[in-house]
C-alpha cells in the first residue's frame, strides 16, 4: 500500500465535518482537529487523522462521552485535579493546560492532573501551548497497558509519553517521546503498511521477540500478554530499566497524583478508558529575567546545532527543529495519508452518512484492502 497527499485545507475541512457528525460543537471540533492535524503536520501520522476511527469506536462503545465537561475536583493556588468525566481527551487536556498556565502566571508554577479522560493525541501539543505565553511546559499521559516492564512478559504500563517545551529562538525547544521503544500507533501504521516490525520493538504473549504487528496488537487488546518494549529494549545492559523508570515517572504525574486509573487497568471497563494526564507550566521569571534565560537557552541550542558532526552527517538537530521543517514542507506540498487509512476514512464516512467523494474527489479506493468493510 502507498500514500496519497492532500492539502491541509482538504483534511481540515474533512476532520471538522467528522467531529461534528460525532456530536461535538463546531468550536469543539475545531479544537480536536487542530490537535490531530498538528500531529500530521509534524510528521507524527500515528497520532493524527488515523486516530479518528478509534475515536468513533470509543463513542459507539460508550467509553468516550461527547457531551461530558471537565470538572475541577480539588484545587490549591498552584495545583488542581480535574475529573474529565470520560470526555474527549483533547478538549479536557486543553482545558487542563490552560488552568496550569493561569496558575503559573500567578504563582510561578501550575501543576494539573487529570483522571477519567481519554486518548489526547500528541503530548507535545499541550506542552507547546505554554511557549506562546513565555512559559516552560510539560505534559504526559498514561494509556492502555502496552509496555512490558524490564524482565516481564505482560504489558503493565502504557506508552506513557512525556513532552517538554520551552521558548527559544529561532523556534521553541520541543521534546515529545513515548517511554516505550515505539507507540501503539506506530504498530498500527506498520499493520496498515503490511510490513513486519523491526527487531527489538515487541514481545509476543510468551515474552519472546516478535515482528508480527497484527498479533502483538491483538494480544494488547485481548490482554493476552506481551506488548512493546520500554526504551532501551528488554535487557538492563541496553538500558531497559531507564525506559521503564521514565514510564513510571509519567504514571506518577498522571494516574497516581490524580488518584486515577493506572495503566494496567485502563481500557478494562465497559463504559470508560480511565486514562489520566499530567500537565505543568513554569514561569521562567520565577528564576530571574525571562528574556535573559531565553537568550541563554537559545545560545546553548545554537551551540549544539553547530557542534562537530559525525562522519557522513550533515546536520545536528535540536528537539523541535524537525517538526518545524516538516510542517513547512507539508503545508506547502501536502500531507501524506496511507492508502489503508484512506480506506478506513471511507468506511467512517459510510457509518456517518458523509459523502467521501465530496472531500476526496478523484481518489480510487483500493477495494482489495483488508481494512475495507464495504460500508462506503
Question: Model regions: which residues?
Answer:
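Catalytic-core signal marking the mid-to-C-terminal active-site face
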Residues: 2-14, 252, 257, 262-376
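Residues forming anionic-ligand binding surfaces in small-molecule and nucleic-acid pockets
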Residues: 73-83, 94-110, 210-232
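A generic, well-ordered mixed alpha/beta core segment in the N-terminal half of proteins
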Residues: 79-169, 177-178
Amino acid at each position: 500500500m502507498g500514500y496519497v497527499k492532500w492539502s491541509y485545507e482538504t483534511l481540515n475541512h474533512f476532520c471538522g465535518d467528522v467531529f461534528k457528525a460525532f456530536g461535538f460543537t463546531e468550536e469543539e471540533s475545531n479544537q480536536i482537529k487542530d490537535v490531530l492535524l498538528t500531529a500530521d503536520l509534524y510528521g507524527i501520522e500515528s497520532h493524527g487523522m488515523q486516530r479518528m476511527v478509534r475515536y468513533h469506536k470509543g463513542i459507539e462503545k460508550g467509553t468516550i462521552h461527547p457531551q461530558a465537561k471537565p470538572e475541577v475536583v480539588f484545587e490549591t493556588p498552584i495545583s488542581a485535579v480535574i475529573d474529565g468525566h470520560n470526555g474527549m481527551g483533547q478538549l479536557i487536556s486543553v482545558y487542563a493546560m490552560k488552568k496550569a498556565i493561569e496558575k503559573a502566571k500567578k504563582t510561578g508554577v501550575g501543576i494539573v492532573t487529570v483522571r477519567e479522560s481519554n486518548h489526547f493525541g500528541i503530548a507535545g501539543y499541550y506542552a507547546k501551548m505554554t511557549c506562546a505565553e513565555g512559559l516552560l511546559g510539560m505534559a504526559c499521559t498514561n494509556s492502555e497497558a502496552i509496555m512490558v516492564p524490564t524482565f516481564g512478559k505482560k504489558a503493565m504500563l502504557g506508552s506513557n509519553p512525556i513532552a517538554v517545551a520551552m521558548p527559544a529562538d529561532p523556534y521553541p525547544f520541543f521534546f515529545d517521546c513515548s517511554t516505550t521503544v515505539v507507540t501503539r500507533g506506530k504498530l498500527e501504521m506498520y499493520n496498515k503498511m503490511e510490513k513486519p516490525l523491526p527487531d527489538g520493538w515487541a514481545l509476543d504473549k510468551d515474552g519472546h521477540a516478535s515482528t508480527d504487528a497484527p498479533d502483538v496488537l491483538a494480544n494488547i487488546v485481548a490482554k493476552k500478554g506481551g506488548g512493546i518494549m520500554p526504551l532501551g529494549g528488554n535487557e538492563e545492559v541496553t538500558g531497559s530499566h531507564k525506559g521503564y523508570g521514565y514510564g513510571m515517572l509519567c504514571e506518577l504525574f498522571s494516574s497516581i497524583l490524580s488518584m486515577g486509573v493506572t495503566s494496567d487497568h485502563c481500557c478494562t471497563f465497559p463504559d470508560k478508558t480511565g486514562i489520566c494526564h499530567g500537565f505543568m507550566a513554569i514561569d521562567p521569571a520565577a528564576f530571574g529575567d525571562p528574556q535573559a534565560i531565553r537568550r541563554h537557552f537559545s545560545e546553548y541550542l545554537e551551540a549544539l546545532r553547530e557542534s562537530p558532526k559525525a562522519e557522513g552527517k550533515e546536520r545536528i538537530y535540536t528537539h523541535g527543529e524537525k517538526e518545524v521543517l516538516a510542517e513547512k514542507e507539508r503545508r506547502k506540498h501536502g500531507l501524506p495519508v496511507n492508502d489503508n487509512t484512506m480506506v478506513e476514512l471511507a468506511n467512517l464516512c459510510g457509518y456517518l452518512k458523509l459523502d467521501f467523494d465530496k472531500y476526496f474527489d478523484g481518489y480510487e479506493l483500493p477495494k482489495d484492502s483488508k481494512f475495507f468493510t464495504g460500508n462506503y
